[in-house]
UniProtKB/Swiss-Prot annotation:
This is Leucine-rich repeat receptor-like protein kinase PXC1. GO terms for cellular component: plasma membrane. Belongs to the protein kinase superfamily. Ser/Thr protein kinase family. It is found in: Cell membrane. Disruption phenotype: No visible phenotype under normal growth conditions, but under short day conditions inflorescence stems of mutant plants show dramatic reduction of secondary cell wall formation in xylem fibers, leading to the inability of the stems to support an upright growth.
Length: 672
């Protein structure tokens, strides 16, 4: 008889558990209805229970049947997070690279959250003070959104957090004292509008790049020196501000070129350049602000790669021409409009004059122009500047439209266009500078003694980052179908943390399609030989070639057809006799002959227990390079496939997600 009183509570608990599980399913169903406008989840999210029906991206607790993980990255989801507020057992939320909007406030009800990845969305509003309720938080990534307001001091209450990424937002106010967060291993607040003092220890721990793009921040070198001034909002308190008055937060979109002034302690060569600049200013005033500081010689010799010049566009001996040309059509804009940088951020970063006087190191030349590393006189600002060739005549209005397309795209795996300068004879694009070079140099550079091989973990992490960047481009322009147009290993760059970013987006729009396709070389899709057109499907093909390049270690040029095994003695004769094929055809032929192991880069074969992952990646690459465009996967599908390839890494505890950092022993950080 004693068992009967116990039966009722057990039944009540069972009923409660079923009810809560059903509530989770209802919440996810509402989330899909509110956000899945493209129907990406409709075919899989069927059945009455999210857990027992194995819904895509949903993981549940085996015991309670409650939802514990929701991972739906890069699915073009658009809408608010409101319906997720009832998922109180949720531990991991990964919705990066979608188009989600609204605020993050609903998540403060999810008290068990540990890992939150919401980068690359359209979230706005403020970071709520109630975020401190998430006591178990380990990684928080809200980067590349439109979040405003101050960083709440309550965030310092996180005791287990390892990572906080809130860069590329619109955050304002005083920066909190992050030195109080002893567990914090990674912090990035760059490119916001924060002000205040950053302690020496914090700068050393997280690096100065984690605070760049905030003109109001000050502290130890390379940040501006802090000075104490009277707070304009309160006469009773002092305010710490940078000693440089131009560093006080403000938000102009574009800045006019100031008068050139002298600097104490400048070298004689720079003094001469400044004097020349003053003469140029007089010419500008007289002739409608035609270019300030001279130009590099277009027809004569240019500085070799790696040389350093005093002045970014100064010192050339080539013919100088008026911005109005010789009897040609003049620009419709006023002279003053031609003398300014146009920024895509809400605050001024530097003046055109600063850029023109910066020391410049040529990084390389391409079909569109020359790329320089420019270090401004303040010593703390380094950017990459591309000078477009004159072979790209583009009306101002059309050029500005292209720049708007490129500049409005924000994503952690796409190189950010910070500003541009337009004049009829001079076009400059200013990008963030990435110090670790390109994937091409890592794969093919220094193949001799002393080379540090690029390990498998790094390769798959870099390809996943590149795939996410390209998927974001395709999703952002899914209606207009704007492609990248030039996917290749030299356009996959690495930042200081070893994260891959896609470069050169949109610049193919400035070229004639025939010329744009010609520069693709071995990355060109087969249909582009007949139909001279750039497309997103052709991008997928190029990405597939890139995958094969990473797997084989071979550049996408021509290779002997492996019609039979070749001995060392017969190599020379056979190379003359055998037909040559491109990289995808070469890989297919080797696989067809069942010599799959010969496909892979010998540097990879020394690693154990990765054969399945390499073969899986090979299948993804081959799926991307099928000759028929309509049979190729979308980049969103490619991202999913790459994410499913598991790489053995060194976890640090139950909730440590090492895959969010691409850095590996084969990738050393440099300042380039």
């Amino acid at each position: 008889m004693a068992a009967k009183p116990l039966l009722l509570p057990l039944l009540l608990l069972l009923h409660l558990s079923i009810t809560l599980a059903q509530n989770d399913t209802n919440a996810l169903t509402l989330f899909r209805l509110q956000t899945d406008t493209h129907g990406n989840l409709a075919g899989n999210w069927t059945g009455s229970d999210a857990c027992t029906s194995s819904w895509q991206g949903v993981s549940c607790s085996p015991s309670s049947h409650r939802v514990t993980e929701l991972s739906l990255p890069s699915l073009s989801l658009r809408g608010p997070l409101t319906s997720l507020s009832s998922l109180d057992q949720l531990r991991l939320l990964d919705l990066h690279d979608n188009r989600l909007n609204g605020t993050v406030s609903p998540l403060t009800n999810c008290k068990n959250l540990r890992l939150v990845y919401l980068a690359g969305n359209d979230l706005s509003g403020e970071i709520p003070k109630e975020i401190s309720f998430l006591k178990r938080m380990i990684r928080l990534d809200l980067s590349d959104n439109n979040i405003r307001g101050v960083i709440p001091r309550e965030i310092l209450g996180f005791t287990r957090v390892l990572t906080i990424r809130i860069q590329n937002n619109e955050l304002t106010g005083r920066i909190p004292d992050f030195s109080q967060m002893k567990s914090l291993l990674e912090l990035n607040v760059s490119f916001n509008e924060l002000h205040g003092n950053v302690s020496d220890g914090v700068v050393k721990k997280f690096g100065d790049l984690s605070f760049s793009g905030n003109e109001g921040l000050c502290g130890s070198d390379p940040l501006p020196v802090c000075t104490i001034t009277n707070d304009p909002e309160s006469s009773n308190t002092d305010q710490i501000v940078p000693s440089n008055p131009t560093s006080i937060p403000h938000s102009p979109v574009s800045v006019r070129e100031p008068e050139i002034h002298s600097h104490r302690g400048i070298k004689p060569g720079i003094i001469a350049a400044v004097i020349g600049g003053c003469v140029a200013v007089i010419v500008l005033v007289s002739f409608g602000f035609a270019f300030c500081c001279g130009r590099l010689d277009r027809n004569g010799e240019r500085s070799k790669s790696g040389s350093v010049e005093t002045g970014f566009v100064g010192g050339g001996e080539g013919k100088r021409r008026s911005s109005y040309g010789e009897g040609g059509e003049s620009d419709a804009t006023s002279a003053t409009d031609r003398s300014r940088l146009v920024f895509f951020e809400r605050r001024k970063q530097f003046e055109l004059d600063d850029l023109l006087k910066a020391s410049a190191e040529m990084l390389g030349k391409g079909s569109l122009g020359t790329v320089y590393k420019a270090v401004l006189d303040d010593g703390s600002t380094t950017v990459a500047v591309k000078r477009l060739k004159d072979a790209n005549p583009c009306p101002r209005k059309e050029f500005e439209q292209y720049m708007e397309i490129i500049g409005r795209l924000k994503h952690q795996n796409v190189v950010k266009l910070r500003a541009y300068y337009y004049a009829k004879e001079e076009k400059l694009l200013v990008y963030e500078y990435l110090p670790n070079g390109s994937l091409h140099s890592l794969l093919h550079g220094n193949r001799g003694p002393g080379r540090i091989p690029l390990d498998w973990t790094t390769r798959i992490s870099l390809m996943l980052g590149a795939a996410r960047g390209l998927a974001k481009i395709h999703d952002e322009y899914s209606i207009s179908k704007i492609p990248h147009g030039n996917i290749k290993s030299s356009n996959v760059l690495l930042d200081r943390n070893g994260v891959a970013l896609i470069a050169d987006f949109g610049l193919s729009l400035l070229l004639n399609p025939v010329h744009a396709i010609a520069r693709l070389g071995g990355y060109r899709a087969p249909e582009q030989s007949e139909i001279k057109r750039l497309s997103q499907k052709a991008d997928v093909y190029s990405f597939g070639v890139l995958l094969l390049e990473v797997l084989t270690g071979k550049a996408p040029s021509i290779f002997p057809s492996p019609s039979r095994p070749r001995s060392a003695a017969s190599v020379a004769v056979e190379e003359e006799e055998e037909a040559v094929v491109d990289l995808p055809k070469w890989v297919r032929s080797v696989v067809k002959e069942e010599w799959t192991a010969e496909v892979f880069d010998p540097e990879l074969l020394r690693y154990k227990n990765i054969e399945e992952e390499m073969v899986a990646m090979l299948h993804i690459g081959l799926a991307c390079v099928v000759p028929q465009p309509e049979k190729r996967p979308t980049m969103a599908e490619v991202v999913k496939m790459v994410e499913e390839i598991r790489v053995e890494q060194s976890p640090v505890g139950e909730d440590f997600d090492e895959s969010r950092n691409s850095m590996s022993p084969s990738l050393a950080t440099t300042d380039g």
